[in-house]
A protein has these predicted regions:
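N-terminal periplasmic "start-of-domain" segments of outer-membrane beta-barrel proteins
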Residues: 1-14, 44, 52
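Residue-level detector of the transmembrane beta-barrel scaffold of outer-membrane proteins
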Residues: 56-58, 116-120, 149-153, 193-197, ...
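Short acidic/polar hinge/loop motifs at secondary-structure boundaries
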Residues: 44-46, 62-89, 110
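Extracytoplasmic beta-strand/coil segments of soluble accessory domains associated
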Residues: 22-63, 83
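Strand-connecting loop/turn motifs
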Residues: 54, 112-116, 143-147, 189-193, ...
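Flexible loop and strand-edge segments within Gram-negative outer membrane beta-barrel domains
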Residues: 159-179, 185-187, 191-245, 252-257
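Transmembrane beta-barrel domains of outer membrane proteins
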Residues: 24, 48, 88, 108, ...
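Outer-membrane beta-barrel translocator/receptor signature
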Residues: 66-68, 81-83, 94-106, 110-165, ...
Length: 260
């Protein structure tokens, strides 16, 4: 049976001033992104009302995001690395993984197509008390004969804590995040292609109160520090005028987490 795929393209991210995947997904029908903890502020995606563990996050159609990374991963994927996002809702998406009962979110990253570069910066404020700064950049380099190419991206995000009801405890915690990555390809022949990709994220977040003090000196604090390194390689071979294809791939991820 055919499967309905909803696509979130770059126009949606640009028109909504989204800087992360979590912000852009909020504008997709049947998908809700909510903050589940006012201390650590981790986001959770609900598809058709089902909780986050019932959804599968893919990168380039492959499940390389671990379950632990998926808890905070929605905010750790910057918009400037995304070409589009494909959302499949319903039980049919379970073909992509055992936990994809509610749906699947497939992130297609940018492929180097032409020589180009882009730099962006944004400042925002919530209720005049919580400032957020975002800076991002992209560079793409491609050979004249398209035999090889590489796309690099980098983003920086810094957000102050937000206290909506003035009780001294944050509703959104302090956030500082750096992300860097690349995607490259090489074509040994007209019918084969080698792909390499890598990205790293260094994130610090803290929620609670008394942010000017050490965590153990405050009334309540939840603090996490992530260092994530992940990458993958694939080999595609076509024959019979691109009607047939064999694809081999491998991926690895290392997560360092300090949770207080």
């Amino acid at each position: 049976a055919p499967t309905l795929v909803n696509v979130v393209d770059l126009k949606i991210f640009e028109n909504t001033n989204s800087t992360t995947l979590a912000q852009g997904l909020s504008f997709q029908p049947g998908v809700r992104v909510e903050s589940n903890c006012q201390n650590c502020g981790f986001p959770q995606v609900r598809i058709n009302g089902l909780e986050g563990p019932y959804s599968q996050i893919l990168i380039n159609s492959r499940p390389i995001i671990s379950a632990l990374s998926g808890v905070y991963g929605l905010e750790q994927i910057p918009v400037n690395m995304i070409e589009r996002v494909e959302v499949v809702r319903g039980g049919g998406s379970a073909l992509f993984g055992a936990n994809a009962v509610g749906g699947t979110i497939n992130i297609i990253t940018k492929d180097p197509i032409s020589n180009s570069f882009q730099v962006s910066s944004m400042f925002s404020c919530m209720d005049g008390q919580s400032w957020e700064q975002y800076m991002g950049g992209n560079v793409s380099l491609v050979a004249k004969d398209n035999s090889y190419g590489i796309a690099l991206y980098e983003s920086y995000r810094n957000r102050n804590p937000y206290d909506r009801d003035d009780d001294g405890f944050s509703e959104l915690g302090k956030l500082n995040m750096n992300t860097f990555g690349f995607r490259a390809y090489y074509r040994p022949t007209h019918f084969s292609r080698i792909n390499l990709e890598y990205h790293t994220t260094n994130e610090f977040r803290r929620g609670g109160n008394k942010f000017d003090l050490q965590p153990h000196e405050s009334d309540i604090t939840e603090q996490t520090k992530h260092i994530i390194n992940s990458g993958g390689a694939s080999y595609d071979l076509f024959w019979r005028e691109y009607k047939h294809k064999i694809s081999l791939y491998g991926s690895v991820q290392h997560l360092s987490l300090i949770h207080i």
